[in-house]
């Protein structure tokens, strides 16, 4: 992702995954959204999720993301502590589908030391600097989810959760300094992240992945 940012030349930026698909209306949607919502720095369109074969995907992850998405499925801009709380409660964003104002993503950049939660970290940084995120349910992107992804492997191994825990505790500290008590509390508890780890424990145990069981169990109670 950092290398991609070195090629930015235009005021709007999109960094998609290798096998994700922009729908034909994506660019037009983005340009119009940026014009209509000058207070937004990040743009999240509606997303259809597909598996490695191109079929619709309805995994537990999708159901959880749908639960945490804004309940009002109309275009809206989230900002400040409200944006931080929304994302920290449960990461409902589809990172490869996001678009950004170049001045924002280049000005803030990705935090060092994160490989899995870099999207949440950047969105939280935007929120803490006063930027807004437009959520528009207009479908414009196909996001591909398959079991062989880097984040899926890290999840079963439990290694991603050490990074998540470190991130949430860092956010709790930083948001506490801003006086964002609710956001700090949500980050400190990181309930959805713990539940995610707990849901993977049976799979890790069945696979006799004892390291994964240990890592996942630690995150559930930490």
Tell me the role of every PLM-derived stretch.
Residues 10, 37-40, 131:
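Short, high-confidence coil segments that cap the C-terminus of an alpha-helix
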Residues 13:
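Short aromatic/hydrophobic "clamp" motif used to bind/position activated sugar donors
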Residues 67, 139-147, 152-180, 203, ...:
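Catalytic core of nucleotide-sugar-dependent glycosyltransferases
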Residues 25-65:
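Conserved donor NDP-sugar-binding/catalytic core segment of glycosyltransferases
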Residues 18-21, 46:
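The conserved acidic donor/metal-binding loop of glycosyltransferases
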Residues 6, 68-160, 164:
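Conserved nucleotide-sugar donor-binding catalytic segment
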Residues 1-8, 21:
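Glycine-rich, basic loop-to-helix element that forms the pyrophosphate-binding segment
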């Amino acid at each position: 992702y950092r290398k991609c940012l070195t090629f930015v030349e235009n005021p709007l930026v999109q960094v998609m995954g290798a096998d994700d698909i922009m729908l034909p209306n994506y660019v037009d949607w983005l340009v119009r959204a940026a014009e209509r919502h000058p207070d937004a720095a990040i743009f999240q369109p509606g997303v259809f999720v597909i598996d490695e074969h191109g079929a619709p995907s309805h995994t537990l992850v999708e159901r959880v993301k749908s639960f945490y998405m804004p309940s009002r499925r109309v275009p809206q801009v989230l900002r400040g502590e409200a944006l931080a709380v929304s994302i920290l409660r449960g990461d409902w964003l589809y990172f490869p589908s996001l678009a950004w104002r170049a001045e924002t993503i280049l000005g803030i950049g990705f935090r060092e030391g994160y490989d899995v939660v870099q999207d949440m970290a950047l969105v939280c940084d935007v929120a803490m600097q006063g930027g807004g995120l437009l959520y528009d349910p207009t479908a414009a992107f196909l996001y591909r989810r398959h079991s062989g992804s880097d984040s899926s492997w890290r999840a079963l191994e439990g290694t991603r959760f050490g990074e998540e825990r470190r991130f949430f505790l860092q956010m709790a500290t930083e948001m506490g300094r801003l006086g964002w008590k609710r956001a700090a509390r949500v980050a400190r508890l990181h309930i959805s992240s713990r539940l995610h780890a707990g849901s993977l424990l049976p799979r890790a145990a069945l696979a006799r992945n004892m390291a994964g069981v240990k890592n996942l169990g630690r995150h559930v109670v930490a």
